[in-house]
A protein has these predicted regions:
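Positively charged n-region of N-terminal signal peptides that target proteins for export
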Residues: 1-8, 12-13
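Hydrophobic core
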Residues: 13-19
Length: 417
């Protein structure tokens, strides 16, 4: 899905290009074209007025749809507004490739780097510090060990803690009426300690605790991080099963669904592509509706699922938890401010600030999905004006964090509705 940022700059430039392309028009049209082009140039100049030229490199762990959306937004909208040139890597799979990219970025005149390469934050911070380039890592945890580095700014991390809240909200939306259901939770990489999966699984278990007023016989975190399939036994006798793993999900889960024991399927990873067909077949065979909650992203398959009904006449997917992308904007805002002499405002007292980013969005209806995925929505639901408003001497990592925290489904739909 192509996102575009809403800005006077983009509108003016688009109008200019349209009018200028009409060669052979009357002199009045040519005059209008000249005036529009002049106004667009003036607007663009004013939008980046006061910002010294800057170059930022992004070291990407994957080159996927989110990467393409971020690249388009940064190059075409954010960059011109903040006077920033961007440099992008290919997919980086190891620390050696990460180091090489950072060194190439330095040779290309970059002033700063940010990365979302898992496990590479500390090493990248050290290399950037040695080269005199400001650095922000995208991570779900802070990095206090880097706080003595003068060029280490902080962490702009997807809110791992927010996954617990997001999954709780999804479950409340789908089964919050308290009618007894049996639930199968696919905990994904929680057994390996992956924070967002642990939080998503634990948040789901706590939500069920609240919905049914039950008490587990075992610690919630122990259940969430179990490396083997485990029943979350409780005093209400409600069947809740936690199933770990990321490989061969269909092989593992299909027999469980075919047993007819489960009414609700919760995936802490994107399970629709691998289990959508299996769930549909079980629903047809057993004549029952299985509620489907999954982590997902904006895509053609997700859109089709939200706008289609299954064999039981229900929405194919009942709720999705959407990964946030605000950390890209947060990283750029933090680096712009650091480069402009406001690095301390981007750090807390211990020199190791973390901007958690937006809580993952929960979408439960086709109407919500279609509105949020529309082409007129800005990248990460933040306008250019809002980004510019966080790049000045008054901005702090707290104000950047607050902007991200405001990005809930309800607020976004109200803001752009």
């Amino acid at each position: 899905m192509k996102k575009k940022l809403i800005s006077a700059v983009a509108v003016a430039m688009a109008a200019s290009m349209t009018l200028t392309a009409c060669g052979g028009a009357a002199s009045s049209a040519a005059s209008t074209s000249d005036n529009t082009a002049s106004e667009a140039a003036t607007t663009e100049a004013e939008s980046s007025e006061g910002y010294q030229p800057m170059k930022i490199a992004f070291a990407a762990q994957a080159v996927d749809e989110t990467f393409v959306e971020a690249k388009n937004a940064l190059e075409n909208e954010i960059g011109p507004a903040l006077n920033i040139e961007f440099m992008f890597s290919e997919a980086i799979s190891d620390n050696g490739a990460l180091n090489t990219f950072i060194e190439n970025a330095y040779a290309s005149g970059c002033d700063a780097v940010y990365t979302n390469v898992t496990g590479g934050i500390d090493q990248a911070a050290a290399v950037c510090n040695d080269l005199g380039m400001y650095f922000v890592g995208i991570s779900s945890a802070g990095a206090e060990e880097n706080r003595e580095m003068p060029y280490y700014v902080g962490v702009a991390g997807a809110s791992a803690e927010g996954y617990g809240e997001a999954y709780a909200n999804a479950l409340n939306a789908v089964i919050g009426d308290g009618a007894e259901q049996s639930i199968l939770i696919l905990s994904g990489a929680a057994c390996y300690g992956a924070t967002s999966f642990v939080e998503a699984t634990a948040g789901s278990l706590r939500a069920l605790q609240d919905i049914y007023g039950l008490t587990y016989t075992e610690d919630v975190n122990a259940l969430a991080t179990s490396s083997t399939q485990v029943d979350a036994e409780n005093d209400k006798g409600i069947k809740i099963t936690v199933c770990p793993g990321m490989q061969d999900i269909a092989t593992t889960v299909s027999p469980l669904l075919q047993s007819g024991d489960y009414d609700v399927l919760v995936g802490t990873s994107n399970i629709y592509d691998s289990l959508g067909v299996a769930v549909d077949e079980v629903e047809k065979a057993l004549g029952k509706d299985i509620k489907f909650i999954t982590r997902s992203m904006f895509s053609d398959s997700t859109k089709a699922a939200f706008n289609s009904t299954d064999s039981q006449g229900s929405q194919v997917i009942d709720a999705i938890v959407l990964n946030g992308t605000y950390e890209h904007l947060a990283a750029v805002m933090m680096l712009r401010n650091a480069f402009d002499g406001h690095a301390d405002a981007m750090r807390d007292g211990d020199h190791c600030s973390r901007v958690p980013g937006q809580i993952p969005l929960v979408v439960t209806t086709a109407e919500e999905y279609n509105a949020l995925s529309g082409d007129d929505m800005p990248f990460s639901f933040v306008t250019v004006d809002e980004v510019v408003g966080q790049c000045n001497a008054d901005a702090t990592f707290h104000s950047i964090d607050e902007l991200g925290a405001s990005l809930t489904t309800e607020n976004i739909l109200k803001k752009f509705g």
